Amino acid sequence: NGTLVSADDFLWASAALVTSDAPKDLDLASELALMAAELGEERGFTVQAEAADKLLVAQARPQRYGTQYIFEPVHQRWKLYPVDPLTSDVERRSMGIPPLAELLQNVEELNDALRKDKDE
């Protein structure tokens, strides 16, 4: 019937909405993700962080948690979209996001895989 009741309902609805680029969808994704978290679904925090970062990136502002990567076609490489330096790894951890050093390592792994694909 389309009614959201359980933590899973809220989580999956928020996860679907966070794929959108529309600010109103991202706002709703954030709300639903927090509701999922309040109902006991820890992954709701991570989806909320993704929605918040995606909104900031759309506004050309530094992201807070570090969930958004961009591809630079000219350099043929991935890059972590700029992150607000005031956000701590403790804050990231509370949202289910890895520390900044690990996020930067993930970028290197993406670029290593990209280079490997080019060489094959």
Task: Give the residues covered by each predicted segment.
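N-terminal alpha-helical interaction modules that lie
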Residues: N1-A7, R61, Y65-Q68, P98-Q105, ...
